[in-house]
């Protein structure tokens, strides 16, 4: 139900205040189930997805009156909700559609879960609830809503609405049940990604839901004031509704019985920095669940050559117990095993080179170092640092045609949000640089640059298997975890990165000698930020080579048709803009350290045996990063489930 207003009245029989949403527009949620098969365990789960259909497809009355738009209004409402997931929200209409989408999917899913729970109270039913008897008051014993980031957080208020308005529970009882049923996973340290909605939009579109959120906020603010008398700063930071905004992360934390980060460093930063006030007030909620990946897709399926080799060496137990990869450590010094491992890598590089030729029309040398950065494009992930270094390296070769280096193929893959202008400009820069470098015969193929379009799981599988170097170069303290780093590690690539996100745990597993770490630490970044940043103009003025690279952004070298094309990127690195600091993500501050790390990669690659040992060690030490381990931690520590044998 969208829009309308809420009418309240007193029920004479029960003496309760009742709330009814009226004059609303609604859509019908139509379920579809996708079976998800377990690996060799006779288990099939269902992934429930939803389509939206109008209550009335055509309003003949409106049509007869000549109001043709009104006649198909309900049909368009339903169609728009499911047409494009997460549209551009740089404008009001986009924000409204996003909120509609979130509530549509959440409401359909929560309603279905509650109805299913209430109906499943018979032995032999699809979800036997003998100890609960389908009484909605006991739903928390069998159901958890794991809020995966802030997008589904409206589920808190929707569950409250269902418990109170549809099942007759009083507020206190409904809140007690909700706070035993909801758990929250935080996936970002970036403040702007912690979703907020304007009160005007939220209350107009979801009037009953807003009433409930408003009451949750009122009661929680009273708790804050009781615990921290006179501390308005605590209220400002922790209130769910404040300064005209509904803060969804705050709602998730207040309602959730568990709040987890997705890497150890991420969780510590949440506790000490971003969510410090909440951690101080409710420390028992906070815990860590480091992300993982499934080896069955990203090794067994994606890299059959390596998969078969591993099974030949240690058996196939690793397919369901990735910790068994540790047995490969017996082979990391074996010359024959090293040769076999690197031959598999070469064949996978040939496969990727073929894909690049077919899709990009670029010839790349499988004997070159495949240096890969594929991930969502965001300034904090610093694809810009990578391409600026490529420009720097190109300048070195142009100045000295005999520049000694192992040929390098820089491979990018990324998508940017529709309204993220500087991210789109960065993609354009990468492609323009690629066009210049790849068509310069004078550098004799020492560098090639490839931007793989439409980066996705299917071409990712080809990329992960072929990478020599895994670029994980986010500004320290900004990446929650990352999982690409794990996929590359599993397939035998060295991590070139900062001590950020799950990189920290990767280094702990493989040892610092089997990674290439550079740049500011998270503590150093946070200290700079607390002190107002640093002055990038000092680097610009004192480092000629960096200055040359930056000037190429605005002198037309890579955009002869429009010298202003990359002006925004240039300005973002050197100039303060309103409340935004120059070089917000410390690209220039880390540039020299990054360039030195890249030089060491070149040096290490020349040591054939040493390189083989390093990348084999990365595969052997990847056991911790299985999603099997991650999910088991959620199941035992958050959902409080116990393992049940499956009949085979």
Label every model-predicted segment.
Residues 1-126, 130-648:
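A conserved ligand/cofactor-binding region detector
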């Amino acid at each position: 139900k969208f829009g309308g207003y809420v009418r309240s009245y007193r029920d004479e029989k029960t003496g309760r205040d009742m709330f009814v949403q009226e004059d609303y527009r609604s859509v019908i949620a139509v379920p579809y189930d996708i079976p998800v098969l377990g690996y060799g365990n006779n288990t099939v789960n269902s992934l429930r997805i939803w389509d939206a259909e109008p209550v009335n497809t055509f309003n003949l009355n409106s049509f007869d009156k000549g109001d043709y738009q009104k006649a198909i209004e309900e049909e368009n409402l339903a169609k728009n909700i499911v047409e494009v997931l997460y549209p551009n929200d740089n404008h009001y209409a986009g924000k409204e559609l996003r909120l509609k989408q979130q509530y549509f999917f959440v409401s359909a899913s929560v309603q279905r879960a509650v109805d299913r729970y209430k109906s499943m109270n018979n032995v032999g039913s699809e979800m036997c609830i003998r100890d609960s008897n389908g009484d909605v008051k006991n739903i928390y014993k069998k159901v958890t809503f794991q809020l995966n980031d802030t997008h589904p957080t409206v589920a808190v208020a929707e569950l409250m609405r269902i418990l109170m308005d549809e099942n007759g529970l009083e507020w206190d009882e409904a809140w007690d049940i909700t706070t035993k049923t909801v758990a929250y996973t935080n996936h970002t340290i970036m403040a702007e990604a912690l979703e907020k909605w304007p009160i005007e939009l939220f209350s107009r579109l979801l009037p009953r839901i807003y009433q409930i959120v408003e009451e949750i906020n009122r009661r929680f603010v009273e708790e804050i004031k009781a615990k921290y008398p006179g501390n308005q700063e605590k209220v400002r930071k922790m209130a769910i509704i404040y300064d005209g905004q509904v803060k969804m992360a705050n709602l998730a934390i207040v309602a959730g019985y568990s709040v987890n980060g997705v890497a150890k460093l991420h969780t510590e930063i949440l506790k000490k920095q971003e969510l410090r006030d909440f951690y101080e007030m409710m420390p028992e909620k906070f815990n860590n669940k480091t992300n993982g990946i499934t080896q069955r897709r990203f090794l067994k399926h994606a890299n059959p050559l390596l998969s078969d080799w591993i099974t030949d060496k240690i058996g196939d137990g690793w397919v369901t117990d990735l910790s068994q990869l540790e047995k490969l450590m017996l082979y990391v010094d074996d010359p024959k095993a090293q040769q076999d491992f690197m031959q598999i890598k070469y064949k996978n590089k040939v496969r990727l080179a073929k894909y690049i030729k077919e899709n990009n029309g670029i010839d790349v040398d499988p004997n070159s170092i495949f240096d890969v950065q594929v991930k969502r494009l965001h300034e904090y992930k610093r694809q810009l640092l990578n391409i600026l270094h490529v420009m720097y390296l190109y300048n070195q070769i142009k100045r000295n045609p005999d520049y000694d280096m192992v040929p390098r193929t820089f491979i990018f893959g990324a998508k940017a949000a529709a309204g993220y202008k500087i991210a789109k400009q960065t993609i354009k820069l990468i492609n323009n640089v690629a066009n210049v470098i790849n068509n310069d015969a004078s550098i004799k193929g020492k560098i090639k640059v490839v931007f793989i379009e439409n980066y996705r799981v299917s071409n990712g599988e080809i990329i992960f298997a072929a990478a020599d170097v895994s670029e994980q170069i986010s500004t320290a303290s900004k990446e929650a975890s990352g999982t690409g780093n794990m996929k590359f590690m599993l397939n035998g690539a060295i991590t070139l990165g900062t001590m950020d996100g799950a990189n920290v745990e990767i280094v702990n597993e493989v040892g610092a000698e089997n990674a290439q770490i550079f740049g500011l630490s998270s503590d150093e970044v946070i200290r700079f930020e607390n002190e107002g940043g640093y002055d990038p103009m000092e680097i610009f003025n004192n480092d000629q080579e960096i200055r040359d690279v930056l000037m190429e952004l605005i002198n037309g070298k890579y955009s002869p048709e429009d010298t202003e094309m990359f002006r925004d990127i240039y300005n973002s690195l050197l100039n303060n803009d309103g409340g935004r600091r120059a070089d917000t993500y410390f690209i220039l501050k880390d540039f020299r350290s990054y360039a030195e790390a890249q030089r060491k990669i070149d040096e290490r690659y020349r040591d054939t045996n040493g390189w083989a040992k390093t990348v084999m060690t990365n595969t052997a030490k990847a056991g911790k990063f299985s999603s099997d381990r991650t999910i088991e931690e959620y199941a035992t520590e958050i959902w409080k489930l116990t393992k049940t044998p499956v009949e085979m």
